[in-house]
Structure formats: C-alpha cells, structure tokens
Amino acid sequence: MLSKLLTKVIGSRNDRTLRRMRKIVDEINKLEPQFDSLQDEDLKAKTVEFRERLDQGESLDLLLPEAFATVREASKRVFGMRHFDVQLLGGMVLNNCQIAEMRTGEGKTLTATLPAYLNALTGKGVHIVTVNDYLAARDAETNRALFEFLGMTVGINVPNMPPQAKKEAYSADVLYGTNNEFGFDYLRDNMAFRPEDRVQRERFFAVVDEVDSILIDEARTPLIISGPAEDSSDLYTRINLLIPQLVKQDQEDSEDFRGDGHYTVDEKSKQTHLTENGQEFVEELLTQQGMMAEDDTLYSPSNISLLHHITAALRAHVLFERDVDYIVKDDEVIIVDEHTGRTMPGRRWSEGLHQAVEAKEGVKIQNENQTLASITFQNYFRLYSKLSGMTGTADTEAFEFQSIYGLETVVMPTNKPMVRDDMGDLVYMTEAEKFAAICEDIKERFAKGQPVLVGTVSIEKSELLSNALKKEGIKHEVLNAKFHEKEAYIIANAGQSGAVTIATNMAGRGTDIVLGGSWQEEISNLQDPTDAQIAQIKVDWKVRHETVLAAGGLHITGTERHESRRIDNQLRGRSGRQGDAGSSRFYLSMEDGLMRIFASDRVSNMMKKLGMEEGEAIEHPWVTKAIENAQRKVEGRNFDIRKQLLEFDDVANDQRQVVYELRDELMNADDISGMITQNRDDVILAVVDTYIPQQSLEEMWDIKGLEERLKADFDLELPIQEWLDTEEKLYEEALRERIVAKAIEVYQQKEEVVGAEVLRNFEKTVMLQNLDTLWKEHLAAMDHLRQGIHLRGYAQKNPKQEYKRESFELFEEMLDSLKSDVVSILSKVRVQQQEEVDRMEEERRQQAEELARRQQYQHQNAASQIADESDAGQPAESGTFEREARKVGRNEPCPCGSGKKYKQCHGKIN
C-alpha cells in the first residue's frame, strides 16, 4: 500500500528516469534553430569537430546534446524526417546501455542512428545487430545516406561474404549485421592462424534490435562451428527402420502399473523415455539385426552409441514434425526457427538428431559433426564494452535482462496515444470449432474491407487455415517459412483494405504494416519517378488509409497462445501503430499445445460446469487468468533453462577466454622462444621427477627408465648412468640441471643448423596447431562431462560444483598436454630448411580451407540438452543417502534428494 502511494507521489523508477532525460531533450530542442541555420558543409564539419573534442578529453555524455541535434538536422535534410522527442529519449536510453521498449511503428530504426553516430565518433566502431539478413541489408541501405552525409562509413555483415569484404565491413564506423554472423565471426577469428586472417576489431558498442528475440529467445541455443566426424549414416538408416515398430504408452510405468507400450513422451521437456518393456523389445530387435550380442544389454558401456542412436531416432519420429519443426526442400532437412517461423538453412541440430530426422525423411544423411568452437549469445554479447537494445516487448522479461546482462529496461512513451482494442480470449472445446469461428470472423471483416493479420504457431496450422479460407473464397496471402522470400512485399501490403494475411509465428517482424499499404514501396517500384507521380501516389494512399481507418484499422487474430506472453504481445503490437485504430483477439481450444500441457484440467472442468455446447466459446476473466498462469509457468521454466545454460557455459567461457587470449598472444608474437624454453624446462623437469623423486635416496631412482623416456619423448640420448658412475659428487639437483642444460644445448645446435628465423616460425606453427587440436578434444570431453554430470546427484553431490571442479582438472590436463606435445615435437623434428616450414604452413592452410568448406554453423538444441540437468542440477540436500537394491519406481521420490518424482528428475536420463 505504502509503495503504491509513494509511486503515485514521486513516480515509478521508469518515470523518474524519463523525467531526468527530458531535461536533455529540452536542451537538444533549444539547439534546433541554431543547427537549422547551418550550411550543409558546416553541418558535415561537426563530425570532425566532435572527434577533435573527444581527442582533447571531452566525454561522450557532454557531446550528446550537440551530436543528437546534428543527427536530427541531417535526417531532416536527407530523409525529410525529424526525430520525435520520444526517439531522442530512446537514443539516450541506448547510449546509457539500457533497453528501450518502443512500440511498433515508433521508429526504432531511426532512433538507433542517434547513439550509433555518437559512439562512432570514438573511431572504435558501432555494431547494430538485427535478427535476419534482410533487415540488416535494409537498415544499412536506408541509413547509409544519413551517415555518409555526416562523413561516416557504413558496412553490412551477412553470411558468405569473402574475408576481405568482411574485414572492410568491420572497419566501417557503423556496421549492420545479424546476431549469428557476429557470433560466428568471433569464433572464426579465434580459429585463424595469422592476425591478417581475422576480420573483427574490438567489440565496443552494440545496439541489438529486437533484443528480446536475440538475448532471450535465442539464448538457449549456442552458436557452434563444427567439422565432419566419422560416417555413421548406415547405422541411422538401420535404426530408423526399427522405430515404427515401437508403440507409445500414455502412462508411465510404476510399481502398480507396467504397460505394454515401448516408450512414453514428456511434451513439456521434449523428451522420450523407453519403458522396461520397450528396452527389452529394442534389445530383441537389435539382436535379431545382428547389431547387439544376445547376452548384452542396451545400457552396457559398449552400447552407448546404439542407445544414442535409438534416443535420437525416437525423438525424431515422435517429437519433431515436418512443416512444424522443419521442412524438406531440395533433398535437405531445413530447421524452422520456433520463434520466428523462418527457415534456417545451414543450421543443424546436434547430438545426431539432424541425421535421425534425415533418415526418417529418406533424404541424404550427412555426417555427424564434431564441435570446433562454440559460444552462447549471452557470453558473446557480454564481450562488448557497451551493450544496449530495443524492442516493442521487453518489460515482461525486465528481470532477466537485469539479472543476466545487467541491462535496465526503460518503457518509452508513445508519440501518439495507443487506441487499439484488445478483446478477451475466446476458448473452444476443439480445434475444428476454433478454426470455424476464426474463418467466420475473417469473413465478416473481409466483407467490410478491414485488413486482418492472422498469427499461427506453425506452417501446418497456417496451411490448414489457408485451405479453409480458400473454400470460403477469401483471397489471402500466406507468409511462413516456405515463402519468406516475398516476406517484405506481403507485409508491406498487409494493411490494404480487405487484405487477409496469415503469418507463421510473427514472420515479417521488423517491417511496419502501414494502413492502406506502403506508399514508399510503390515509389520504389517506379524507375525515376517524377514529383507529380510521387504526389499522386501519396494522395491515393491517403484515401486508402482513411478507408481502412473507417473499417476499424488492422485486426489481429491469434490462433493460439504462445508459450510466452511476450510473443503474443509482439503479434498484437503489429496493430495500432502511431495512434492508428486497430483491434486484436486470440482464439484458443482445449486441443492447443499450451492448453493441453499446462492449463487443460482446470479450464476443461470450468467449461464442462458451464455446459458448453458445440461451437460455443467461453470468454471469462478466470479463463484468461488460467492461461496467463500457464504462460508464466513456461516462462519461468524457460528462464531457469537459460540461467542453467549460462551457469554451465560460464565455466567453459572462462576457459575459452584463456585459450583465445593465448592464441592472440601467439599470433601477434614474432618470437615465442621464451615461452618454448620455459615449457621445455617444465616438461623435462616433470619427467625427471617421475624417475628421480625429489629428496629421495639413489636406490629409489630409475635411471634406465629415465634414459629410455628422454630418448622416446625428446630424442635425447644422455649417458646418465655413466655420469653417476664416474662422478661421485653428482647429486640430484646438479643432475637435474645438467639434463636441462643438455636439452638446451641440443636445441641450440638445431637452431644453428636451420637458422633462428626458420625455427621461430616453426615453433609458432606447432604451438598453434597443437593448441587447436587439444582445444577441440577438450570441447568434446566437456560435452561428455556435461551430459553425465547430473548423475552426481545420486551421490549427494552438487552437479554444478562437480562440473566446475572436473572441467578445471580437464583444462589443466589440456594445458599440460599442450606443453609436453609441443616440446616433444620440437625436440624430435628435423627441420632442414625454410622451404619445409613453408610447405608445412601451406599444407596447414589447405587443410584449414578444406575444413572451412565443410564446416557447419548450427544452433544446438540446448533446451533438450539441459532438460535433464535443470531438475537434477540443484544442490543436494544434506542427510544420509541410502540406496535400495530394488529398482526405483518412476512415480517414487527420486533418490537424489530433490524431493521430485523419479520420472521428473533422474528418471529422465533415458
């Protein structure tokens, strides 16, 4: 009560933030007449003046009012568009490393030019990050004229650019690109062998457009660069033939129940589990096929690979649907992004899932891949000195932005009041009833000329609705993963009178729907339009615009509630831009995924009590509340998954930073002989300690073993026994020093033969090659450790702590192996001349180019990877852990002490 009263008196934190910034807006507005009177040349000269003032120690904050006034004036002259005050506020929020929540149509693209110009004055470069290639190219081309007018360069960063073109793009003052491409460039740069092969420079300031999509929706999916592993396509094909013989069982096995089915499905966590009956049946099938010995079991260590293939194939058949999770095009399985409905060519699911789906669809099975480098968006974007973002929907995720990225969300006021009518949800018993009601509503709105945008959750649903509308004779456009090449055109015309547009899962995001259609689109289609043509197009558009407003503006129809309220708000946000009229409504059924999994019992009972008849809908605040609660549950679970991913990836990230810093040091150094000398001393002394323990009696020494080891590992033939026999005063410490000195002497002789320069180049090449090989193997070891670490809960140990401890041990082992491998190679190799080093370098370059051609860039399905760990990864409760000899029932409390049922905890390991 008191907090509400205080908020009313002094305003919320958001209000106070905006109030402080409005003073600076007033300052910028006062400068407008002065800047308006400047000649073009004087306005352009401001950039040089600002840079000189920065060099003299003036801060960006002091420059901000004048810099923003400069951009606003330049925009008026170049585009004929003046930044609104709310856009100036948005620009300040972005410069302050905060997230600006700006409604659709408020001009986020133009807002970003303000902080981009200000921060680009430093010469360090600004990255404006978008969700797809089309938006990156569009925004770069749209704003290029403005930045170039002010003497700044603009670049674009999209896939498949030649390295030199990428390097030039990164040297631009302002660079537009996609989140994936920035992340992959970072990983590729840290796989390069020469400084000149890298494209990125320092990561200074990033403005992330649609920040919720990139930093929240895609945060669960790490970016992975992988190379081809061994061919196992035949195994996928053979196992794929077995899966259709398995029968689904609806109820989990327990002490009181053992079903006849072979597997159960957990839709919430997207997991499948073999039942006891299923395990026996699969073992029988594998034995018949000669793929497993008769007396063997599926869970024996020798059959881990078979279990991996069975699990992947079962998930592919049961949980991944064609035209929902992926499409098949040109004999390829292409993933559909669950958040945007866009296809993701070149991206592949990991852990054999993609190959299992290829086997299921009968297309060519590509080799499994081995991880070469990976990073999450969370850890990539935290590398920037300054990070900010903008979106139409951030407030529901404000806590996550603050806790994970340290970014405060500021909700921006609209330039004009929002008048959209958001109507209550209508809930039907069946999907058929729901779609019949949607068709009827569209028919009525179509008849009066009101444009309708229909949001669906999958390609399958969009095509189902499309077929129903065709039967009714209603002309419409379908925008989904299959046809997103014409996305911008369809969206540009979605506001025309009577237009009906079906869009899968917010495809087309980033393009405004203008009532009456886009007059800019019409003008761009003309070659050299005259002033008269442009004027006529604007007059015609004005008439169409008023007609659509009179019909009620754009109506949004949601065919299903998304797991996240934010995605629903994004769909609604397409209507009511810039104070336009509009309306929205969601239609739901008890057969929808969200309702079936999370809200079914409560709402279904409510509907039965009300005596619902076929075709009748329920509209009640209780139902809306139940649905919101279901969405909150999913949002909470997804937040936990993202947080879990980050906690595990933070461990790997610390190691990644060490390795990448070492690579940088190696690449930039002309001479690493000091590092090699230190490593050689450490490695040889460690070997000597193994055979001559420190402060030990001579009787405990294994001199013969030491001589053999030095010969085998370092090609050092030393008569150590002879030294000891002939020199009475050759004690342990003196002996250690002599062995190291002899190793140095032999290496110096090698340097005299081949020359210092040749050997320095060779040392660097060997060090880099071995570091990359061992890092790749270390990533694989970390993956294996991660997949099984949740089992430590059985032993009353905290899996996260165990993961940290063991991954550190693995990392130390990797660094020790790097030292010993490099010293061994350099000691044993015979380098004759510079040509040999050049040949070796050329071979390495060719191998790297071949690997680059075969590299896969993918988003790992991290949700499935973590689903097991999210429950088991909690700190174990204290107390004695007693394991019973009998098998734990799936509905019994899990032995790990989490308090959850076994099937919801460690029973998920299948």
UniProtKB/Swiss-Prot annotation:
Classification from the root reads: Bacteria, Pseudomonadati, Pseudomonadota, Gammaproteobacteria, Vibrionales
Reported EC number(s) for this entry are: 7.4.2.8
Ranges where the record places region Disordered: 561-584, 835-910
Give a GO biological-process term: protein import
Quote the catalytic activity from the record: ATP + H2O + cellular proteinSide 1 = ADP + phosphate + cellular proteinSide 2
Q: Which InterPro entries match?
A: Helicase_ATP-bd, Helicase_C-like, P-loop_NTPase, SEC_C_motif, SecA, SecA_CS, SecA_DEAD, SecA_motor_DEAD
UniProt subunit comment: Monomer and homodimer. Part of the essential Sec protein translocation apparatus which comprises SecA, SecYEG and auxiliary proteins SecDF-YajC and YidC.
Q: Which CDD domains match?
A: DEXDc_SecA (cd17928), SF2_C_secA (cd18803)
Q: Which PANTHER family match?
A: CHLOROPLAST PROTEIN-TRANSPORTING ATPASE, SECA INNER MEMBRANE COMPONENT OF SEC PROTEIN SECRETION SYSTEM
Obligatory cofactor(s): Zn(2+)
What cellular-component terms does GO give this entry? Answer: cell envelope Sec protein transport complex; cytosol; plasma membrane
Q: Which HAMAP family match?
A: SecA
Q: What is its main location?
A: membrane
Q: What is the role of this chain?
A: Part of the Sec protein translocase complex. Interacts with the SecYEG preprotein conducting channel. Has a central role in coupling the hydrolysis of ATP to the transfer of proteins into and across the cell membrane, serving both as a receptor for the preprotein-SecB complex and as an ATP-driven molecular motor driving the stepwise translocation of polypeptide chains across the membrane.
The annotated topology with respect to the bilayer is:
Peripheral membrane protein
Q: Which family does it belong to?
A: Belongs to the SecA family.
Q: Where in the sequence does UniProt note compositional bias of the Basic and acidic residues kind?
A: 561-571, 841-853, 880-890
Cofactor binding comment, as recorded: May bind 1 zinc ion per subunit.
Q: Tell me which residues bind ATP.
A: Q87, G105, E106, G107, K108, T109, D512
Q: Which organism is it from?
A: Photobacterium profundum (strain SS9)
Q: What is this protein called?
A: Protein translocase subunit SecA
